Amino acid sequence: MGFPKVERLLINYKTLDEFKKFKGCGALELSMLEELQANIIENNSESPFYGIYYGGSLIARMSLYMKRNGGEPFEITGPYLELYKLEVLPTFQKQGFGQMLVNYAKQLQFPVKTIARIHSAGFWDKLNFQPVSVTNGDFYIWHPETNMNAITNEESA
């Protein structure tokens, strides 16, 4: 078994079955099952879902969307990534798999926006994301130009 790596997940029935493992682990706001079901096309390679397999099973996942322009409230100009619903199965938490997913997004060298869910603010702080408060909610942003040393070759996916 090789070292786990981040890979784009196919939108198919196998991935749908893998997502069901996460259903009882997290809050409803982290569920991707319905989102996947709505987009299911057998083996679609343009999936917004990324994950880490370990021992043949999906153990961590996230959604990653490219957005065209952040605009005023987001403090981002130009294209950026929205990272949603990062989740690691309980048995595999605190082993660096969540950080591997985030580093995958960072190595694309676009600003990354995310919402800290379920007491995860410390996680985003540790990964050099900056908190931003606006009238319609709080979120975190990582800017590649201000974090040039935030990713080392050993950390990137």
Model regions and ranges:
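Short intrinsically disordered terminal tails
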Residues: 1, 152-157
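Conserved GNAT acetyl-CoA-binding A-motif
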Residues: 102, 107-119
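Conserved acyl-donor/pantetheine-binding loop and adjacent beta-alpha core of acyl/acetyltransferases
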Residues: 29-85, 93, 136-142, 147-149, ...
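Extended, folded domain segments that form the structural surfaces/walls around functional sites
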Residues: 85-86, 114
